C-alpha cells in the first residue's frame, strides 16, 4: 500500500490539554493555507494501547489531502498519555508541539461537566475530586489518562515533552488569551512557526459542549454570513449554557479550595517553566 504522505511526516501536533481550546484553535487553523489536517480532528494514533508503530496506517488518515507545509494532528489525549511524547519523538523528532493550557480547576470542572452530559459520570464533583486526588497521591508516577484531576497537572506532563524536544519546537498557549485576544494569540503562534499571519473577521467559538441537536444547527448557522445570523448565534450559545446548567450538579466552594491546594505545587513549577504569572490560577 502506498504511503498517503508520500515520504513526508506529520510535523505539527497539538497534544492538549483537553477542554482548553484545542477545538477553537483547530477550527481557525483549518482555514489557513499552510496547514493540512487529517480527515478527523483527533487521530489518537500515539495514545492507542497496545501501540504498534504502523505509520502507513497513521498516514492513511491524510489520504486525499493536499499536503501543505504543516501536516497536523490535533489530539488532546497526547498530553496526558504517559507514552505519547516518546512515541511522537520516535516517529518524528522534528515535530512541533502545541500545548494549550487552561486554569486547571476550570478545566477539571469543564471535563467533569462533559462526562456528566455524555453519561460517563454519575458521582458529584466533590466525590470525583476526592477519589482522583487520593489516587494521584499514591501513584509513584503521574498517570493522568482517565483522571479529571490528573489532566490538570501540567508541569509534570510538559516535562515529558521537554525531555524529548527542544524548547523552540514546543509552543505553549493560554486558553484565556485564545478566548480574549484570539487574533493576536493565534498570530503569535503562527509567527513562532514561521507562517503567515491571519485576519479573523469574527471570533471563533468552537464549543464541543453543545448538545448533539444544537451542534447540528450550529454547523449550518456557522456557514452563513455573520450579518444574518448574529442574533441566532447568541440564542444558540445561551441555549447551550442553559442546557449545561440543567444537566450538571453544582460545584461547591470547599471542593474548589481542595483542588486549588492540590494543584499549587504543580502550578508553581509551571510558572517557573513558562515565565507566566499564574497568580490567578494558584
Task: Please give the residue ranges for each predicted region.
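PAPS-dependent sulfotransferase catalytic core
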Residues: 1-82, 90-95, 104-138, 165
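PAPS-dependent sulfotransferase catalytic domain
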Residues: 52-64, 120-202
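Aromatic-acidic/polar surface patches that form glycan- and anion
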Residues: 7, 15-18, 51, 77-81, ...
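Generic structural signal for secondary-structure transition and capping sites
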Residues: 34, 67, 113, 198, ...
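Alpha-helical packing segments of well-folded alpha/beta enzyme cores
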Residues: 58-61, 84, 154-158, 185, ...
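The conserved 3'-phosphoadenosine-5'-phosphosulfate
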Residues: 159-257, 261, 276, 281-282
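Generic secondary-structure boundary/loop-capping signal
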Residues: 32, 42-43, 75-76, 151, ...
Amino acid at each position: 500500500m502506498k504511503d498517503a504522505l508520500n515520504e513526508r511526516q506529520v510535523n505539527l501536533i497539538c497534544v492538549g490539554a483537553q477542554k482548553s481550546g484545542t477545538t477553537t484553535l483547530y477550527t481557525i487553523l483549518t482555514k489557513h493555507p499552510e496547514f493540512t489536517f487529517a480527515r478527523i480532528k483527533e487521530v489518537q494514533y500515539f495514545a492507542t494501547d497496545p501501540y504498534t508503530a504502523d505509520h502507513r496506517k497513521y498516514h492513511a488518515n491524510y489520504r486525499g489531502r493536499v499536503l501543505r507545509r504543516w501536516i497536523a494532528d490535533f489530539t488532546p489525549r497526547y498530553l496526558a498519555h504517559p507514552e505519547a511524547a516518546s512515541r511522537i519523538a520516535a516517529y518524528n523528532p522534528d515535530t512541533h508541539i502545541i500545548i494549550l493550557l487552561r486554569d486547571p480547576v476550570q478545566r477539571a470542572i469543564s471535563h467533569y461537566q462533559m462526562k456528566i452530559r455524555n453519561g460517563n459520570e454519575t458521582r458529584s464533583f466533590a466525590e470525583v475530586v476526592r477519589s482522583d486526588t487520593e489516587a494521584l497521591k499514591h501513584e509513584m508516577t503521574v498517570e493522568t489518562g482517565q483522571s479529571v484531576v490528573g489532566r490538570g497537572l501540567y508541569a509534570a506532563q510538559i516535562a515529558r515533552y521537554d525531555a524529548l524536544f527542544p524548547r523552540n519546537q514546543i509552543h505553549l498557549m493560554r486558553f484565556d488569551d485564545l478566548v480574549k485576544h484570539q487574533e493576536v494569540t493565534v498570530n503569535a503562534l503562527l509567527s513562532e512557526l514561521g507562517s503567515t499571519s491571519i485576519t479573523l473577521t469574527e471570533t471563533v467559538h468552537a464549543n464541543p459542549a453543545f448538545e448533539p441537536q444544537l451542534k447540528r444547527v450550529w454547523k449550518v448557522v456557522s456557514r452563513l454570513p455573520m450579518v444574518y445570523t448574529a442574533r441566532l448565534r447568541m440564542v444558540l450559545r445561551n441555549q447551550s449554557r442553559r442546557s449545561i446548567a440543567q444537566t450538571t450538579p453544582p460545584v461547591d466552594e470547599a471542593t474548589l479550595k481542595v483542588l486549588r491546594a492540590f494543584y499549587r505545587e504543580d502550578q508553581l513549577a509551571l510558572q517557573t517553566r513558562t515565565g507566566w504569572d499564574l497568580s490567578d490560577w494558584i
